[in-house]
């Protein structure tokens, strides 16, 4: 299950308990709440959750070199900080995360310094095959896509959120789910 470099025999949780704890992880129940429900030591549940995250991280790293093709959605989101003050693009104290969603497939995310074209275009060219259909919002950073070998469609959120296939609802939903989980 785990790659050898992640082997750790310090976790003392019975196999039966791991089988019972795994669904709680999937349902996004906190480790401490799962421990209370299962009647195990909270530290055991925390360590078990950490091991699951390590395994997930390992397999995601193996898939990190995947190149997307076909219909993909691009968007950036801002994480961290408090809701005080400026929100959205340019919000101070927040981390910019750029995401690529393959429709009906995987999502690739990467922390970037900013959402400018010079920052995003190298990631886009590395992760998306030329001639792919790329859907974005109206951010000016995506202006170069149509001259970079991609079929580019924009959605103007001030007018509408979807126009048949022209939308970025998939990646927007991903951001919503990620932020909801991280708030826990």
Q: Where are these predicted regions, by residue range?
A:
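Residue-level recognition of single "structural anchor" positions
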Residues: 1-184
């Amino acid at each position: 299950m785990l790659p050898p470099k992640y082997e750790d025999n310090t976790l003392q949780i019975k196999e039966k308990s791991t089988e019972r704890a795994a669904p709680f992880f999937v349902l996004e129940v906190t480790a401490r709440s799962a421990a209370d429900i299962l009647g195990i030591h909270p530290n055991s549940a925390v360590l078990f959750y950490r091991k699951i995250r390590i395994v997930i991280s390992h397999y995601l790293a193996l898939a990190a070199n995947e190149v997307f093709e076909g219909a993909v959605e691009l968007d950036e989101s801002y994480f961290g900080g408090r809701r005080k003050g400026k929100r959205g693009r340019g919000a101070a104290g927040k981390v910019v995360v750029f995401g690529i969603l393959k429709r009906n497939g995987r999502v690739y995310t990467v922390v970037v310094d900013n959402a400018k074209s010079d920052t995003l275009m190298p990631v886009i060219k590395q992760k998306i095959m030329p001639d792919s259909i790329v859907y974005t919002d109206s951010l000016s950073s995506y202006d170069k896509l149509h001259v970079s070998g991609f079929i580019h469609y924009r959605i103007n959120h001030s007018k509408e959120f979807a126009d048949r296939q022209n939308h970025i609802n998939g990646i927007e939903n991903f951001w919503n789910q990620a932020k909801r989980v991280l708030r826990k």
